[in-house]
Amino acid sequence: MSASKASTADRERAQAQEQPARQEREQATQRDSGQPEFKNGEKPAQARWFGEAADDVLTIFERSRPGRRAFVAPPLGVPDRSLDDLLPSRLRRSAPPRLPEVSEPELVRHYNRLSKRNFDLDTGFYPLGSCTMKHNPKLHERVAALDGHARLHPLQDPRRAQGALELMWQLQQALAEIAGLPYVSLQPSAGSHGELAGVLLTRAYHEDRGQRRTKVLTPDNAHGTNPATVIMAGCEVVKVGTDEQGNVDLDSLRSKASDEVACLMLANPSTVGLFESGIEEIAKIVHGVGATLYYDGANLNAIMGICRPGDMGFDIVHFNLHKSFTQPHGGGGPGAGPIAVSERIEPYLPRPVVIRRPPEADGAEPEYDLDYDRPKSIGRLRGFHGNYGVFVRSYAYIRSLGASGLREVAETAVLNANYLLARLRHHGIAEHLPAAYDRICMHEFVLSGSPMKRELKIKTLDLAKRLLDHGVHPPTVYFPLIVDEALLVEPTETETKETLDRFADALAEILREAREDPEIARGAPYTTPVRRLDEAGAARRPVVRQPC
């Protein structure tokens, strides 16, 4: 076989082997598109995109037909060479890879259809609790795409990358001011990465003092990444309880605090959207046993410009630039989780750190550099210096708004959440979806679907699925775990009153339907290409790749 010619025999055999699986999936799709019978005889419409055919849920592999091509390379101006001459048999596959064979129009249409099915912030309301899915200004994309930013190589000599280093240094200063702590590292590339950095810094700090502290305290409403981070750092998770008002239970904290504790990981506002009213006492208890206080910055959007974690007594703070500072997120990144620390933690920051040297002469410019001379550092956290494009967008956001603008962001986020919560309470929705905590919330709030499940016979999952038919991305469901049938709603500051009203109306309509016929919600969604997945089957028989 020559390298320039593709054999179709193996592909045809592969297609024949794949045909039964394809037919089974097509039949399953047809079965899935069937709708339940409802008591009132009416069925919600099964929507289909204009121009969409019945087989549009097929994967690109299932569209494959032997011999089809999207592109055919022209003949080369060199003689054909046998594959045997080019590669020894030990480096060759035993059969050609079973890659999809489709025409160019099929390829374009397939991915174009998929792109239109994406739901994102540019499509509609996205109140995913604890994720801060707010509008990301498009101007920042243009700034990040400038050649001086987008084409800069990470190995560029610092002397020829002064503009980029200056931006990073300026961002460090801005984040330090927002956190109320003097030193910042931009290296961590995600929130959980920032958490890991924080726990490693805490461990290094205690070890440098000759102390082996292996326990890390986390409240029972903490993000799931908190205990996972603790385990990754080689420490032990110790849970601290919360009281009926959603605050850290101070008696529980006192009983767990000891000289074995390295730190307490805490979000403020907490994961249930409430401000920790006892934060000063919490800091006193933690510092009283020689431990550090770590700030999970997942909910910083609610307080930035109003109060600062460092002023509350926190020693280490991580930021989610992809949440509070408008880096687009979802789908796996990129993100950024910089950390700010107090003076006693500074020696252990990851290396290198961006520094500014004063001008050597009057009228000269300051010089920016990367400082590797950090003997107590925990080392590098990644190959280069962080996700630079994220830094550009976040810096543009901070400079665009200024201090007063950032404060207005936080105030509006809290206002929107409390308006929406009040609207739910005063329009009968709270009867079946009450707030988990009867107090003023911050940027988000938790509802409990227990009364709805008990009285209307639909679960929080059913409600979330039915919201898809109303063109709304569902809030976070079944988290935090301490609230039964939880629904965590975060409207963010960039949504209008009309959008919040439409969301409340959608909830009211779903509850009205459930009173008359709960089967409607149980069968939802009806307007998506794929309905409910077989979660048990997916767990027992996962298909994680197409065979090649």
State where each predicted segment sits:
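Short, well-ordered loop/turn and helix-capping segments at boundaries between secondary-structure elements
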Residues: 204, 208, 232, 259, ...
